[in-house]
C-alpha cells in the first residue's frame, strides 16, 4: 500500500526522533483511532519498495496490505462506531 492511502483516510502522522528512539535516524508512522480501536502503520524505516502495511495496535496477528480492504475496514468501523463516513 502507498503512504498516500493513510493520509487520505485521515491517519495522523507521528514523527519519532532518533533521540527518542535510540535509532540512528528519525522515522515516522501513521495512526488512526476509531472508537476504542487503533490502527497503526509500519514504521517508515521498515518500508520496502514503498509498500506500507497496517495493523491493529491491539493485535500483532492482524496485518493488512491491501488498499481496498483497508478502505472497507475503515468505512465499516466508522459506521459501527457511528462516526462520519468519509
What are these regions (language model features)?
Residues 13-14, 32, 46, 74-77, ...:
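Residue-level marker of intrinsically disordered, low-complexity segments enriched
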Residues 18-68:
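Acidic, low-complexity, intrinsically disordered interaction modules
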Residues 1-15:
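Amphipathic alpha-helical segments
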Residues 6, 59-86:
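Ampiphathic alpha-helical segments that act as solvent-exposed interaction surfaces
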Residues 8-10, 19, 37, 50-51, ...:
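Compositionally biased, intrinsically disordered low-complexity segments
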